[in-house]
Amino acid sequence: MGDSSMNISVLGIDIAKNIFQLHGVDSSGKRILKQRIVREQLSAYVANFQLCTIAMESCVGANYWARVFQRQGHIVKLISPQFVKPFVKTNKNDANDAEAIVEASIRPSMHFVPVKQVEQQDIQSLHRVRSRLVKNRTALINEIRRLNLEYGITIPQGALKVKSHLRSVVDDKENELTISSRELMEELYDELVEFEERLKKIEKKVKLICKEND
């Protein structure tokens, strides 16, 4: 690392899965660093800088790196990608993106995205998984209702109603279900119960995290 790297005022980082592009400027806005670096070396590399402002787009992985750099003492600014795009001067590539991030970060009117701490990240992750489970459960419920209609069996809407009615359908030996279709409905019932149990676990975890951080 050259001496100029130690005088960086603002460092823009275009984050990726493996290769990161860095663009550093001094207090006058002059570029003094243009560097590509692999993920495994990024933290140690930036730790050698004098404390500066580090700007990144608020994309996947940004909150993790923001926390890493904050622990090193740097000031971190996250910017929504839509606000960085207007500052890309030429063709879009990693180097130009990193430069655009710096340009956007020094604008007085720029709005920044708060860095999520680990607990906030946990809650967001749980909510995302919960949303997916709810979507998949809804698809399962719709499939259960459609399949039963093929056997002349109507099941009302709503997760709780579908669950209780499907159990009754499986246990009812007088309906048109064959051994094969009854086994299928039993499997669908078990799948629905599993969704309910997973959703309850997630909701319990969210409440626990919120309680621990009150």
Identify the residue ranges that each predicted region occupies.
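A detector of single, family-specific signature residues
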Residues: 1-214
